[in-house]
Swiss-Prot record:
It comes from Herminiimonas arsenicoxydans. GO terms for biological process: methylation. HAMAP family: Methyltr_PrmA. It catalyses: L-lysyl-[protein] + 3 S-adenosyl-L-methionine = N(6),N(6),N(6)-trimethyl-L-lysyl-[protein] + 3 S-adenosyl-L-homocysteine + 3 H(+). This is Ribosomal protein L11 methyltransferase. GO terms for cellular component: cytosol.
Amino acid sequence: MSWTEIVIEVARTHAEALSDALFDAGALSVSVEDADFGTDAEQPLFGEPGMEPTEAAWERSRVVALTPVEADQAAIVAEAAESIGLAAADLAFTLRNVDDQDWVRLTQSQFEPIHIGKNIWVVPSWHDVPDPAALVLELDPGLAFGTGSHPTTRLCMEWLEAHAPIGLSVLDYGCGSGILAMIAKKLDADTVVGIDIDPQAIQSAVFNTERNHCDVAYYLPDEFAASGHAHTFDVVVANILANPLKLMAPMLAGRVNPGGQLVLSGVLATQVDEVTAAYAPFIALTVWAEQEGWVALAGRSPVTVPDGQ
């Protein structure tokens, strides 16, 4: 079976509304990308919670809608344009054919074993383990963020390897796939807890943890609050994004035992000052390492709590 993609270049102000309108008009999937991708004008952009919809797109955005080959693409564009108050003539579009493929095989071919730090391997289930003597996680791409391919995940994993939490309690806040929680457990942490706001992430983390024979408890935030579990930890790791990390500064800092360590990633090098400022009343954070423009911040909680806190 073949498919047809509708490709439309629009201003940032229309990108999200047009995406929704194309869905409503019959598109099977819609993506938004930088119209200047691959050129000197390409603009790195990372959507974060708290962003206005118009901020989560590029000045020149390319909206790509996948449709059945037999669909009336011109009618889909016209309906979408009308629903957002534009004339169809204002939306110039091109079409491109997409041949059907063995998508499972294609996806698998894009994921190879990943070597992280000194002795960690993340290996998809369809690959052989390169080094059975290493610390190995079997992990497939799935519903939740975290396969070790992104610099922020690697930074947190490398921090854990360099500061092995032997016998310590560890909290992975925003656990996603559970990759950091599992690494902590395989590095001989005592109690390990993962928390995420996404039920699908919890489902994914539980599946991955059972596959890797790790003992980790996973909770949604409300479930954790009602669990009776100790609410502070020797090590707290949060690989999220700068805006939510700033908003959660009092809560995350409050999860760290006196003398314990807090590790944050999901922070761009250009965002270091604003994130460290948010945590300054609680924990002094410094840049531990940087990869590809992303940083890991780390700091130790005071042994005694400052007056007034």
